[in-house]
Amino acid sequence: VPLAMTPLLGLLSQPIGAAGMARMPLEVQSLAVWSMINGLGFLIRSVGTAFNEVVVRHAGDRGAERTLSRFALVAGLAGSTVHLTIAVTPVGAWLFRHVGGLSPSLAAVAADAFLFAAALPILAWLMSLWTGLLVHARRTRAISEAVVLFIVGTAFVLVLGAKLDVMPGAIVANV
Protein backbone atom coordinates (compact mmCIF):
# COMPACT_ATOMS: atom_id res chain seq x y z
CA VAL A 1 0.00 0.00 0.00
CA PRO A 2 1.57 3.32 -1.01
CA LEU A 3 2.15 5.77 1.84
CA ALA A 4 -0.06 8.34 0.11
CA MET A 5 -3.03 5.96 0.40
CA THR A 6 -2.80 5.55 4.18
CA PRO A 7 -4.97 8.57 5.10
CA LEU A 8 -7.68 7.33 2.75
CA LEU A 9 -7.47 3.85 4.23
CA GLY A 10 -7.66 5.36 7.72
CA LEU A 11 -10.92 7.04 6.76
CA LEU A 12 -12.40 3.60 6.07
CA SER A 13 -12.70 3.13 9.81
CA GLN A 14 -15.52 5.70 9.89
CA PRO A 15 -18.13 3.74 7.91
CA ILE A 16 -16.90 0.51 9.52
CA GLY A 17 -17.51 2.14 12.91
CA ALA A 18 -20.99 3.31 11.95
CA ALA A 19 -21.92 -0.12 10.62
CA GLY A 20 -20.66 -1.76 13.80
CA MET A 21 -22.46 0.67 16.12
CA ALA A 22 -25.70 0.06 14.24
CA ARG A 23 -25.53 -3.57 15.34
CA MET A 24 -24.89 -3.03 19.07
CA PRO A 25 -26.97 -2.02 22.08
CA LEU A 26 -28.18 1.60 22.11
CA GLU A 27 -27.53 1.77 18.38
CA VAL A 28 -29.63 4.88 17.72
CA GLN A 29 -28.21 6.72 20.72
CA SER A 30 -24.65 5.68 19.81
CA LEU A 31 -25.02 6.92 16.25
CA ALA A 32 -26.65 10.13 17.52
CA VAL A 33 -23.72 11.02 19.81
CA TRP A 34 -20.92 9.72 17.59
CA SER A 35 -20.30 12.95 15.66
CA MET A 36 -20.17 14.97 18.88
CA ILE A 37 -17.73 12.71 20.71
CA ASN A 38 -15.66 12.08 17.60
CA GLY A 39 -15.46 15.80 16.80
CA LEU A 40 -14.58 16.85 20.33
CA GLY A 41 -12.02 14.08 20.61
CA PHE A 42 -10.44 15.06 17.30
CA LEU A 43 -10.28 18.69 18.40
CA ILE A 44 -8.27 17.64 21.45
CA ARG A 45 -5.89 15.32 19.60
CA SER A 46 -5.56 17.25 16.31
CA VAL A 47 -2.35 19.04 17.34
CA GLY A 48 -0.87 15.63 18.12
CA THR A 49 -1.84 14.44 14.67
CA ALA A 50 -0.06 17.42 13.09
CA PHE A 51 3.06 16.79 15.20
CA ASN A 52 4.11 14.24 12.57
CA GLU A 53 5.25 17.09 10.29
CA VAL A 54 7.40 18.61 13.03
CA VAL A 55 9.06 15.25 13.66
CA VAL A 56 9.81 14.70 9.96
CA ARG A 57 11.40 18.15 9.76
CA HIS A 58 13.50 17.96 12.93
CA ALA A 59 14.27 14.24 13.37
CA GLY A 60 17.73 14.69 11.86
CA ASP A 61 18.70 17.53 14.19
CA ARG A 62 21.23 16.76 16.93
CA GLY A 63 19.48 15.43 20.04
CA ALA A 64 16.10 15.79 18.37
CA GLU A 65 14.77 12.29 18.94
CA ARG A 66 15.01 12.59 22.71
CA THR A 67 13.56 16.11 22.73
CA LEU A 68 10.74 15.21 20.35
CA SER A 69 9.95 12.07 22.35
CA ARG A 70 9.80 13.98 25.61
CA PHE A 71 7.64 16.70 24.05
CA ALA A 72 5.25 14.11 22.56
CA LEU A 73 4.92 12.37 25.91
CA VAL A 74 4.24 15.58 27.87
CA ALA A 75 1.87 17.03 25.27
CA GLY A 76 0.08 13.70 24.88
CA LEU A 77 -0.39 13.37 28.63
CA ALA A 78 -1.73 16.93 28.71
CA GLY A 79 -4.18 16.13 25.91
CA SER A 80 -5.36 12.97 27.64
CA THR A 81 -5.72 14.91 30.89
CA VAL A 82 -7.90 17.50 29.16
CA HIS A 83 -9.91 14.71 27.56
CA LEU A 84 -10.32 12.91 30.89
CA THR A 85 -11.25 16.15 32.66
CA ILE A 86 -14.00 16.78 30.14
CA ALA A 87 -15.22 13.20 30.50
CA VAL A 88 -15.47 13.07 34.30
CA THR A 89 -16.42 16.61 35.31
CA PRO A 90 -19.49 18.77 34.76
CA VAL A 91 -17.60 20.42 31.88
CA GLY A 92 -18.38 17.42 29.70
CA ALA A 93 -22.04 17.39 30.63
CA TRP A 94 -22.24 21.11 29.84
CA LEU A 95 -20.47 20.68 26.49
CA PHE A 96 -22.60 17.74 25.44
CA ARG A 97 -25.86 19.38 26.55
CA HIS A 98 -25.40 23.05 25.67
CA VAL A 99 -22.79 23.13 22.92
CA GLY A 100 -23.69 19.80 21.33
CA GLY A 101 -27.42 20.21 21.93
CA LEU A 102 -27.84 16.66 23.20
CA SER A 103 -30.72 15.63 25.44
CA PRO A 104 -29.82 14.59 29.01
CA SER A 105 -30.04 10.89 28.12
CA LEU A 106 -27.88 11.31 25.00
CA ALA A 107 -25.40 13.46 26.94
CA ALA A 108 -25.01 10.58 29.41
CA VAL A 109 -24.28 8.13 26.57
CA ALA A 110 -21.80 10.61 25.09
CA ALA A 111 -20.02 11.11 28.42
CA ASP A 112 -19.66 7.36 28.96
CA ALA A 113 -18.30 6.81 25.45
CA PHE A 114 -16.02 9.84 25.64
CA LEU A 115 -14.44 8.48 28.82
CA PHE A 116 -13.35 5.32 27.01
CA ALA A 117 -11.40 7.41 24.49
CA ALA A 118 -9.24 9.21 27.07
CA ALA A 119 -6.07 7.45 25.91
CA LEU A 120 -6.47 8.58 22.29
CA PRO A 121 -4.73 11.98 22.66
CA ILE A 122 -1.49 10.51 24.00
CA LEU A 123 -1.69 7.73 21.44
CA ALA A 124 -2.07 10.33 18.66
CA TRP A 125 1.06 12.17 19.82
CA LEU A 126 3.08 8.96 20.10
CA MET A 127 1.82 7.68 16.77
CA SER A 128 2.83 10.95 15.11
CA LEU A 129 6.25 10.72 16.73
CA TRP A 130 6.85 7.18 15.51
CA THR A 131 5.39 7.87 12.07
CA GLY A 132 7.54 10.96 11.68
CA LEU A 133 10.66 9.05 12.70
CA LEU A 134 9.87 6.31 10.18
CA VAL A 135 9.22 8.83 7.38
CA HIS A 136 12.45 10.66 8.19
CA ALA A 137 14.33 7.34 8.07
CA ARG A 138 12.53 6.47 4.79
CA ARG A 139 11.15 3.27 6.30
CA THR A 140 7.50 3.86 5.44
CA ARG A 141 6.36 0.31 4.73
CA ALA A 142 5.62 -0.20 8.43
CA ILE A 143 3.25 2.79 8.35
CA SER A 144 1.15 1.31 5.55
CA GLU A 145 1.11 -2.07 7.26
CA ALA A 146 0.04 -0.46 10.55
CA VAL A 147 -2.89 1.30 8.86
CA VAL A 148 -4.08 -1.97 7.33
CA LEU A 149 -3.75 -3.68 10.73
CA PHE A 150 -5.69 -0.80 12.31
CA ILE A 151 -8.58 -1.30 9.89
CA VAL A 152 -8.58 -5.07 10.42
CA GLY A 153 -8.38 -4.59 14.21
CA THR A 154 -11.18 -2.03 14.15
CA ALA A 155 -13.41 -4.36 12.16
CA PHE A 156 -12.59 -7.25 14.51
CA VAL A 157 -13.40 -5.25 17.66
CA LEU A 158 -16.67 -4.00 16.16
CA VAL A 159 -17.74 -7.48 15.00
CA LEU A 160 -16.87 -8.86 18.44
CA GLY A 161 -18.82 -6.02 20.09
CA ALA A 162 -21.84 -6.75 17.91
CA LYS A 163 -21.65 -10.49 18.62
CA LEU A 164 -21.25 -10.07 22.39
CA ASP A 165 -24.04 -7.45 22.42
CA VAL A 166 -23.23 -6.22 25.95
CA MET A 167 -21.86 -2.69 25.50
CA PRO A 168 -23.21 0.38 23.67
CA GLY A 169 -21.72 0.86 20.22
CA ALA A 170 -20.38 4.33 21.00
CA ILE A 171 -18.20 2.82 23.73
CA VAL A 172 -16.98 -0.12 21.63
CA ALA A 173 -16.17 2.18 18.71
CA ASN A 174 -13.94 4.25 21.00
CA VAL A 175 -11.94 1.25 22.18
Give the role of each language-model region.
Residues 29, 89-93, 141, 151-175:
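Membrane-interface helix-loop junctions in multi-pass transport and translocation proteins
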Residues 33-86, 127-135:
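Small-residue-rich hydrophobic transmembrane alpha-helices
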Residues 38-41, 75, 146-153, 173-174:
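Transmembrane alpha-helical core residues of multi-pass small-molecule transporters
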Residues 4-43, 97-101:
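Helix-terminus/linker motif at the lipid-water interface of multi-pass membrane proteins
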Residues 103-130:
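Alpha-helical transmembrane segments of multi-pass membrane proteins
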Residues 81-112:
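Short membrane-interface helical motifs at transmembrane helix boundaries
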Residues 5-9, 17-21, 34, 55, ...:
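Hydrophobic/aromatic residues within transmembrane alpha-helices of membrane transport systems
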Residues 25-28, 62, 136-137, 163-164:
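Helix-loop interface residues and adjacent transmembrane-helix termini in multi-pass membrane transporters
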